[in-house]
């Protein structure tokens, strides 16, 4: 989330994304409040759900034949995309990414502290650090 040093450059892995799934953070926060549950426990629940959906998507897509996208999977459009038409595309998917997105970060701050993210971003940074650490564990 933060550069390791001044020479730290972003690295973009993969040439395709199997599908981003977005967390609506203020809805999760509000659900935690109304059900008297811990916000982070509920956030873990949704992060695990997203992880399982991504794994299922990888499994499902991996069974597809290269013929579904000849340019990508048989003619080199994707990295490793030199398969035969009847080959499964599973080996190519290891270069694809799966995204954990988020939305409503400012609204989350407003619910938590009554202040916008510009006034006080400490909770936003805390939540994003938590999400980042969890995704790193996956």
Language-model segments: residues:
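Contiguous, well-ordered alpha-helical segments that form the cores/surfaces of helical PPI scaffolds
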Residues: 98-111, 129
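Conserved catalytic cores of very large enzyme subunits
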Residues: 1-94, 115-137
């Amino acid at each position: 989330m933060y550069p390791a040093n001044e020479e730290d450059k972003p690295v973009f892995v993969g040439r395709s994304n199997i599908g981003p799934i977005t967390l609506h953070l203020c809805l999760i926060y509000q659900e935690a409040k109304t059900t008297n549950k811990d916000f982070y426990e509920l956030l873990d629940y949704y992060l695990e759900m997203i992880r399982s959906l991504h794994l299922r998507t990888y499994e499902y897509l991996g069974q597809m034949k290269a013929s579904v996208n000849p340019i990508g999977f048989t003619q080199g459009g994707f990295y490793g995309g030199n398969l035969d038409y009847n080959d499964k595309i599973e080996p190519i998917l290891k270069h694809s990414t799966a995204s954990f997105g988020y939305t409503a970060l400012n609204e989350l701050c407003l619910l938590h502290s009554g202040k916008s993210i510009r006034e006080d971003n400490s909770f936003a940074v805390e939540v994003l650090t938590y999400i980042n650490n969890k995704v790193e564990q996956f």
